[in-house]
């Protein structure tokens, strides 16, 4: 049985990338990730029942942590994640096609002269490796969730789930201290 999920880091966060500013951040996996992956897979499967896939109206929009851009969940995949989902979908489609053709060979008593030969597909691709990059963990008090942001980012942030604005450094004020000679 094949399994498809977005790779997580050691703390359980999933990398996201903004389609507008191209910056990456991490969030906890969402209950909508499965629907988003199903919607993407359905687009690549030529024999999928598209009416059974999640629609854009059923999936919430998410926001970029940095620039506030709003988009559907499937827009937040990194290029590696997107390529992996496409590769996995095409591999699954080849396996389904093979099983449909191999059925004829298994039932040769009904048709002793098949006009084709089914060729076994390549094995399904391995899962993506876990994400190893460490980012700074910050609380989003609006939703009670945590996100991971770039260490260099100290400007205001936007909650990826609800779009609430948070001050730089997660609401803490920056204090500039200077030494004064006496």
Model-derived features: positions:
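Short recognition patches in nucleic-acid-associated and regulatory proteins
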Residues: 17-57, 75-78, 143-150
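Short, intrinsically disordered terminal segments enriched in charged and Pro/Gly residues
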Residues: 1-9, 40, 75-132, 173-182
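Short cysteine-rich clusters marking metal-coordination/redox-active sites
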Residues: 18-21, 64-67, 139-143, 159-162
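Flanking scaffold residues of small Cys/His-coordinated metal-binding clusters
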Residues: 9-13, 58-62, 133-137, 153-154
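Conserved binding-pocket/active-site segment within a compact domain
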Residues: 124-141, 147-151
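Eukaryotic Cys/His-coordinated zinc-binding finger proteins
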Residues: 143-152, 156-179
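Short, extreme N-terminal segment that most often corresponds to the first beta-strand
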Residues: 1-25
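Cysteine-rich micro-motifs
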Residues: 40-45, 57-70, 153-165
């Amino acid at each position: 049985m094949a399994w498809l999920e977005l790779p997580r880091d050691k703390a359980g966060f999933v990398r996201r990338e903004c389609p507008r500013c191209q910056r990456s951040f991490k969030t906890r996996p969402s209950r909508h990730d499965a629907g988003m992956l199903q919607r993407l897979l359905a687009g690549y499967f030529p024999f999928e029942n598209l009416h059974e896939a999640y629609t854009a109206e059923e999936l919430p929009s998410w926001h970029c942590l940095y620039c506030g851009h709003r988009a559907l969940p499937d827009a937040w995949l990194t290029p590696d994640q997107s390529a992996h989902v496409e590769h996995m979908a095409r591999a699954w489609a080849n396996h389904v096609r093979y099983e449909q053709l191999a059925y004829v060979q298994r039932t040769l008593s009904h048709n002793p002269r098949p006009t084709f030969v089914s060729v076994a597909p390549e094995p399904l691709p391995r899962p993506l490796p876990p994400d190893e990059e460490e980012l700074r963990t910050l609380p989003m008090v609006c939703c009670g969730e945590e996100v991971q942001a770039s260490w260099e980012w100290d400007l205001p942030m936007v909650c990826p789930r609800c779009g609430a604005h948070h001050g730089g450094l997660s609401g803490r004020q920056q204090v500039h201290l200077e030494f004064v000679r006496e």
